[in-house]
């Protein structure tokens, strides 16, 4: 990023994304060494119900539906055409919780750096959130960069920054092109009954 400065959340571009209700669709490239995996992700929530889909054409099609009020979740395997149900009121924590560091639940908790980031030949106004986590005992800083076109997010880039034998190593681990962002839930994604009717219920082995 260039022309970087720290800004309060209220002056950030990200303030437009800090909503309990939203729909986000993104084409993603996950980078792991010489391997690149292309996928599409969809997230939509109304603050109570949420829809999350990961689609890797030909390899994976997973959908998770969650209803906070019912304390239930449905995991759909689109490749198999089946789904399972979990009643997580029986668990001390939500079994669907994971460490997905591509999702920020509350931007206001983080220091926000603002500047410009170049994608292709275009420089976009951008906000960056950075936090440190530990991988195999080694601290790694994760930098999440959001590029904006007006008030709408256009790109999301995730970089990992670590120290290797005294040298700083920066790796891009994810590149995402945001194809849709709206500050409301898509009614089609919230219609769980219609979605589940397209799949067969199977018993969860767990």
Regions found by a protein language model. Give the residues of each.
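N-terminal leader/targeting segments and the immediate start of mature chains
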Residues: 1-49, 116, 120, 183, ...
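Extended beta-strand-rich segments in extracellular/periplasmic secretory proteins, especially
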Residues: 3-11, 15, 21, 25, ...
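A sequence-composition feature that detects small, non-aromatic residues
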Residues: 32, 69, 126, 130, ...
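An acidic-aromatic
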Residues: 33-103, 153, 159-179
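Poly-acidic low-complexity segments
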Residues: 67, 87, 106, 186-195
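Short, exposed beta-strand "edge-strand" segments with a Pro/Gly-rich flavor and a Y/T-containing core
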Residues: 79, 137, 183-184
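Short, intrinsically disordered, low-complexity terminal segments
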Residues: 123, 173, 180-184
